[in-house]
């Protein structure tokens, strides 16, 4: 985003004195993005979406498989030198709607390669929200032990009505790291369904609480942030409609 640096500047300025600095992940898709993220105060971790779909990789980042892998290796070296964390998201991990080859063995091969490069934090991503809860659970269960020493999380997109079931399927399979977004803000333009987006943080927390998990976050404490997010979404939704 063109004003990411200004957003981070205002965010840091607004932190109450004595507040522990949260982890901030800067998502990048090319070298220029990496340079900006590393130079932005407050960014603690670099994130990169590595797609195992050739079509999606071209559409999202205009890269070949070789170019994308070379960038991952560059990210690993740069973050090691700078002291930043690094997480790679395996995009299209749960299936491929573009009639390309897909299978658990492709995901496993990618995980093994990422470990060999030096990655220790990887997330399986359902980029277009086409996985069922059963698929989420079965793939995670199959992948969690194939790369010892790698913390494996999930980054799931979903329609609201199926979101909690997918979270619980991953949790029951052993996942302990989940990505979410307040009110389900954001998503992927390639999903082809306006109702598919990031799973809401509040949905994830409620689902995990139903399993007795101690997530360290009180839902009631999130209420003001959720309300603010809803106001922002409404504001920009109305602005977009006015432009149309």
Describe the role of every protein-language-model region:
Residues 1-244:
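Catalytic cores and adjacent flexible loops of soluble metabolic enzymes
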């Amino acid at each position: 985003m063109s004003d990411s640096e200004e957003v981070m500047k205002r965010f840091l300025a607004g932190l109450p004195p004595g507040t522990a600095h949260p982890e901030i992940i800067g998502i990048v898709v090319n070298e220029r993005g990496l340079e900006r993220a590393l130079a932005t105060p407050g960014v603690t971790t670099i994130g990169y979406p590595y797609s195992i779909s050739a079509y999606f990789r071209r559409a999202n980042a205009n890269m070949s498989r070789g170019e994308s892998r070379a960038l991952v290796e560059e990210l690993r070296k740069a973050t090691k030198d700078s002291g930043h964390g690094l997480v790679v998201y395996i995009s299209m991990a749960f299936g491929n709607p573009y009639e390309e080859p897909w299978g658990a063995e492709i995901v496993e091969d990618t995980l093994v390669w990422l470990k060999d490069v030096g990655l220790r934090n990887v997330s399986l991503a359902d980029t277009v929200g086409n996985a069922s809860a059963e698929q989420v659970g079965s793939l995670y269960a199959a992948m969690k032990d194939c790369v010892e020493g790698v913390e494996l999380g999930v980054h799931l997109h979903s329609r609201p009505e199926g979101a909690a079931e997918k979270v619980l399927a991953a949790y029951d399979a052993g996942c302990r790291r989940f990505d979410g977004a307040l009110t389900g803000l954001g998503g992927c333009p390639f999903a082809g369904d306006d109702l598919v987006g990031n799973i809401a943080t509040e949905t994830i927390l409620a689902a995990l609480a139903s399993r007795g998990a101690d997530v360290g976050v009180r839902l009631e404490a999130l209420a003001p942030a959720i309300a603010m997010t809803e106001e922002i979404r409404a504001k920009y939704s109305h602005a977009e409609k006015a432009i149309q």
